[in-house]
Amino acid sequence: MSDGWSRRSVLKSSLGLSLAGVSLSGTTETVTGASEYETLRQRWAQLLTGGDFDATQFEYQDPLAELDETAQDHWETMDTSADRDRLWSDLPIPASSSASASESNITDSYGRLQEMAMAYATNGSSLEDDSALVADIVDGLDFLYDRVYNEDQSQFGNWWHWEIGSPMRLVSVCALVGDELSSTQETNYTNAVGAHTGTPYEYTEYDVTSGGANRVDMCIITALRGAISGTDSTIALARDCIEESDIFQYNTSGGGNGLYRDGSYVYHKEIPYIGSYGAILLEGLGELFTVLDGTTWEITDVDHDVIYDAVGDAVAPFMYRGLMMDAVSGRSISRADQTDHVRGHGITATVLRLANTAPEPYASEFRSLAKGWIENDTWDSFLSDADVPDIANATAVLDDSTISAADEPVRHDVFHNMDRVVHNRSEWAYTISMCSERIARYEAINEENLRGWYTGAGMTQLYNDDLGHYTDGYWPTVDPYRLPGTTVDTRERSTLDGTHHPRPSTQWVGGASVDEFGIAGMEFDAEGASLTGKKSWLHLDDTVVALGADITSSDGRPIETTVENRNLHTDGSETLTVDDTEKSTTPDWSETLTDVSWAHLDGVGGYLFPNQPTLEAKREERTGSWQEINAGGPSESLTREY
């Protein structure tokens, strides 16, 4: 992934954009016969390029310029010599598992060819229909086929690059360059893809049943392989595989992956993930619906409503003014290029795409939700970092006066199957991230979320008018031992190298709601310590009441409960008032406060303490980098005040 903040700078693994060529009425033209193969290819190409749009409109100027610059740079730095052993000097191509180069370089090489192909096929690009460019693109495909990605090559390293990453990019390039490929080249490339992604039912390398977003991606790859090779049975395999999956069924087993009737979405068996893996699942389904709709292979033998209902039941509660909340985004919160607004914008684009094929009343609901999210995001404009196809879909909705933007919801939701609670008001929202014998305390894998120890330990997050609070360097700079809402043993923790998703043994975790109000409770025990206790929260109209009881520990170390820990960004000018006394705004201030009745932090809200406790308060400058919490993140140091 790129270290940049723009969605345009990130080539998403599922390659999901939106389709401008589908009418807003939610229907597509029904096609039959041999033309259907070309229809599928063209639809996928439109998903990537935006199809036919007015490239002179100012909204498209920046993304087109960025696409041109990226493609031109790839082209100029591409090695086209006859004796080359790689396409780009920084992406050596491994030939076996013993090579020092990573198999990810194969995927990245296909990715650069795809970006070049997108410029070639995008309306208004300075490289549109450039014959020299497309010749070098096809030459690059031939090189990768001859060198490493072919039907005779055994897989090595991470399976994903062989079965999803590289083939998704390869079939996308084929769809984009169209008639520039010979029949021999089409056969070679589709045979290579078929060898590594033979059936979407299972992973080729591990003979394990596929599921979730991976299943959807593999079905997309298979459908496009069939369209490129002109093989009806291959496209039918993709359709059958998605129809026979459990994606369109609620999980009723009481645990594990999938969507639940209460709106929960769990992935990796025990992680709340609608903001990441769940979003990718919806994105891929929107693409697959779009490509196959109205064709011989249209997806019909499923309950589409399970997916369409998920937008309102699983996604919308965790969307706040255009951002996707961290509580359901797992380890992705540690990624510099996947902030809450970036994730929210991606989901907005997905919902707009789903609206193109969804029936009423879903289609109107989706456009209304998306319009509200776009218009209410005053921190990070959707259009400022959108891709060309996303802009086409969004502007069609924004410019339509008959579509009303949805207001921020006033609702309370308890997600029993993933130990999450969200309390939405018109001007603020509040989430609680809990854990139990069902749901893990946190997830840390692939050297990501290295300090996420307490993100599921009753962590609370308040969303208000400061829409950049969790976006602006929060996770690399916040004290990971002092997340709001948590009660922790202050023992020193080790960085979470390896794979970690521990669950406690507690069962008493959940909540209940009446209309837009609710209560939540959590019995907790500390990982690696004797600390135990109980917590409850009452969610009212303008107040959240937090209670603690039976909090005990026998380890002899200090136990801390963090009431609040706000990101004051780089200036830290907000005033803290305690019992009518304004406290210092200098970053090094700290004080023991006794008999506290109330406190107020400008721009946030008030805090009442009926028992008049003793509190420790401080302001501090904290410095950290994304790389410290995610090995793949940028090393640049960030400093924020708290």
What are these regions (language model features)?
Residues 7-8, 40-43, 535:
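Short, cationic motifs built from Arg/Lys/His that form the positively charged side of catalytic pockets
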Residues 16, 34-104:
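Low-complexity, Ser/Thr/Pro/Gly-enriched N-terminal "stalk/linker" regions
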